[in-house]
Amino acid sequence: MNKRKILVPLGDKSYEVTLEAGILNNISEELLKIGITKNRKILVISNEEISNLYGEKFLNNLKDNKFQAKMVLIKAGESYKNLKTLSEIYDVAFEFGLDRNSIIIALGGGIVGDVSGFAAATWLRGIEYIQIPTTLLSMVDSSVGGKTGVNHPKGKNLIGAFNQPKAVFIDPETLKSLPKREFSAGMAEVIKYGVIRDKELFKYLEIEKNKNELINLKNEYLIKIINSSIKTKSHIVSQDEHENGVRAILNYGHSFGHVIENLCGYGKFLHGEAISIGMNIAGKIAIEKGLWSKEELERQKILLESYDLPTEIPKINKEDVLTILMGDKKVRDGKMRFILPKEIGAVDIYDDVEDSLFLKFFS
């Protein structure tokens, strides 16, 4: 049996991530197992692309099992992860009569999950929600850990809340319909876990046979890397739910990744692609500070590129880079903090990086 369960231990906010091929087809059964009783109202938040693939079957499964279910579709893309979209969800929630006993289900990628989680955190001061991620990036990263929110014109995820889901259900079968570029973008986050905490995962990803099986979307191989990634994230989140300390290492590559997304315009690079470039920049800074070797930087670069991820730094204005970085959530007391690698499998947080050390990488 290829069903995996991973506990995210957070006291009274603990929940399980269930990972199984085909679980989407038995969603009502899974909801009943975690205590979601029949006749409860369920608002499913998704987007048009995912709805066309799974929406009708998913809703019918819920309704056939006596759940009161309705679906609301939000527009795909980072530019729609905003307060206007949130307000549209509230309108539907009001019309549907979503009460405190109701539940929201996020069926989609990271944007759907982030917006749904924040809608759940704020509707009637908080109702339960469930994550059902359908992209690799959301499976291994954003669906676990409780970070929810929307963007503001001044920056990504500036409006949000920590809101842990009631459960997460992951079906690797949904990756079969994912565009190849989106799959590669998700691999950036998987490789990130290898660099920050799991050198065995990193080595596994370097093996040619594994690489081919992953690119060909073989469930057994997908389940292994998703399981490893979530275990790492779960362990870190359980130590530091609200990112006051060690959880910041999950942002390896993200500070510069957000700079690139912002300054190149949301949409030019997928999130995972920007993170890949950000990891390359962080790796270069680590060389400058004598933290790790050129060989390790090269291993990281080769691995990223082998999954069709970009590593080349785009041409952007140095002054703009500093402006965006100073608005980063990891800034403490006016000091920028960077996650830098010490070796494959270990990183640390540094607040003593001179501007000149990284600005030279931007033209």
Curated annotation (Swiss-Prot):
Pathway: Metabolic intermediate biosynthesis; chorismate biosynthesis; chorismate from D-erythrose 4-phosphate and phosphoenolpyruvate: step 2/7. Zn(2+) binds at residues 189, 254, 271. Binds 1 divalent metal cation per subunit. Can use either Co(2+) or Zn(2+). It is found in: Cytoplasm. Its cofactor is Co(2+); Zn(2+); NAD(+). Keywords: Amino-acid biosynthesis, Aromatic amino acid biosynthesis, Cobalt, Cytoplasm, Lyase, Metal-binding, NAD, Nucleotide-binding, Zinc. The keyword NAD applies. One of its GO terms (molecular function) is nucleotide binding. Its EC number is 4.2.3.4. Pfam families: DHQ_synthase (PF01761), DHQS_C (PF24621). One of its GO terms (cellular component) is cytoplasm. GO terms for biological process: amino acid biosynthetic process; aromatic amino acid family biosynthetic process; chorismate biosynthetic process. NAD(+) binds at residues 134-135, 147, 156. PANTHER family: 3-DEHYDROQUINATE SYNTHASE (PTHR43622), 3-DEHYDROQUINATE SYNTHASE, CHLOROPLASTIC (PTHR43622:SF7). Catalyzes the conversion of 3-deoxy-D-arabino-heptulosonate 7-phosphate (DAHP) to dehydroquinate (DHQ). Belongs to the sugar phosphate cyclases superfamily. Dehydroquinate synthase family. This is 3-dehydroquinate synthase. The lineage of its organism: Bacteria, Bacillati, Cyanobacteriota, Cyanophyceae, Synechococcales. The gene is aroB.
